[in-house]
């Protein structure tokens, strides 16, 4: 409240939310209620194609790549070295961990966590509040709330 009273108009949410997404979301709610603008923050070493579209509050870390026609929702994190290929859609609060790779046309649902070094194949849809463990390979759609264990291939073999 003191910052807002002093005329500060912008704020950045520094809560990552890997283990406690609700903390990250509550900080965004608080910042919005207090009237702060949460700008998109893009590290100078990230490579962003001109046609990529960012909502406010998104954060892009060093050496990340965001391809053509990508849509990045409010409060998303694209962490260090992550690759978001052409035509992907990241819904609000999606969190891509370091080294995650999304092939073209991937859709990531709201408040979903994509772990480190995850690979998601072309045109896969990952549902809301899903959790994809580190090093997983995702070859088919993941439902809302789905969990893909670390180091596995989705879908599991029958």
Spans of model-derived segments:
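Short secondary-structure transition/capping segments
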Residues: 18-27, 54-60, 84-97
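Phosphate-bearing ligand-interacting subdomains
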Residues: 1-43, 47
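Residue-level signal for short amphipathic helical patches enriched in basic/charged
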Residues: 18, 67, 85, 103, ...
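Hydrophobic, well-structured mid-protein blocks that either form specific transmembrane helices
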Residues: 27-84
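Glycine/Thr-rich phosphate-binding loops of Rossmann-like dinucleotide-binding domains
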Residues: 21-22, 68, 140, 156
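Glycine-rich hexapeptide-repeat left-handed beta-helix
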Residues: 80, 91-92, 97-158
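Conserved acidic residues
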Residues: 9, 56, 110
């Amino acid at each position: 409240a003191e910052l807002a009273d002093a005329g500060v108009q912008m704020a950045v949410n520094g809560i990552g939310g890997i283990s406690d997404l609700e903390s990250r979301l509550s900080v965004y709610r608080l910042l919005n209620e207090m009237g702060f603008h949460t700008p998109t923050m893009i590290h100078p070493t990230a490579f962003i194609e001109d046609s990529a579209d960012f909502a406010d509050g998104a954060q892009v870390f060093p050496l990340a790549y965001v391809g053509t026609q990508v849509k990045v929702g409010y409060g998303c994190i694209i962490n260090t070295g992550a690759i978001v290929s052409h035509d992907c859609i990241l819904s609000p609060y999606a969190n891509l961990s370091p080294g995650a790779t999304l092939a073209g046309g991937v859709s990531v649902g709201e408040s979903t966590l994509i772990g480190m070094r995850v690979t998601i194949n072309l045109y896969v849809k990952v549902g809301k509040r899903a959790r994809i463990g580190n090093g997983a390979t995702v070859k088919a759609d993941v439902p809302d709330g789905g969990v893909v264990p670390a180091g596995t291939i989705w879908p599991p073999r029958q």
